[in-house]
Regions:
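Beta-propeller folds
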Residues: 1-191
């Protein structure tokens, strides 16, 4: 209920071989949530997003699955709140794609495996309104945005380096997409 204390959150890793559980020491955090947990492409590294109660300060942690030690690879702060999404995508080299409103608009960013910004993939005074995914074979990102006007949502592809942007939707209005698993085909829903 609003105003009541949050549940106490803890994070543990269970090793199937040794049958031992390791607790991740999150003692530096108080009154927090863990809204997302996801394995990276490194089999021994777990990612966890730790968010303060006010939901305006988020740390992305990389946790060593063997030792339960962690490092903060990314921090997001906002005066109002940090939007939680399921857009975190790990690439083969364990670099990752992340969406953020840190420049005032929701855009797509590429970070290396240590959390160092490689490049801002999308840029402009408009928002990415949906992140559809990453085509590893062709190094392309697929997304929806309002870059053609606030009442128009179009579907795009763009290279990981931020070049070769291509509008995929043909009609003006609201376009949504559902992509095939290999990103070779998509269904365009238009209204």
């Amino acid at each position: 209920k609003a105003g009541e204390k949050n549940a106490v959150v803890s994070l543990h890793i269970y090793d199937l071989k040794t049958k031992k559980t390791s607790k991740v020491d999150l003692g530096k955090y108080t009154d927090f949530y863990i809204p997302r947990i996801k394995w990276t492409n490194d089999a021994n590294v777990l990612s966890a997003q730790v968010l303060n109660r006010h939901q305006n300060n988020l740390d992305l942690l990389f946790i060593d699955g063997n030792t339960a030690d962690f490092k903060i690879v990314l921090n997001e702060k906002d005066k109002a709140y940090v939007d939680i999404t399921d857009n975190l995508t790990f690439l083969d080299d364990n670099s990752f794609i992340w969406t953020s409103e840190k420049d005032g608009f929701n855009h797509i960013y590429h970070y290396d495996k240590n959390g160092k910004l490689k490049n801002q993939i999308t840029k402009g005074n408009w928002d990415v309104t949906n992140y559809y995914g990453f085509d590893n074979k062709n190094s392309k990102i697929f997304y929806q945005s309002v870059e053609n006007g606030s009442t128009k949502r179009d579907v795009y592809s763009i290279d990981l380096n931020g070049k070769n942007k291509k509008r995929l939707s043909q009609n003006n209005g609201t376009n949504n997409a559902t992509f095939s698993p290999n990103f070779d085909l998509f269904i365009n829903n238009y209204s």
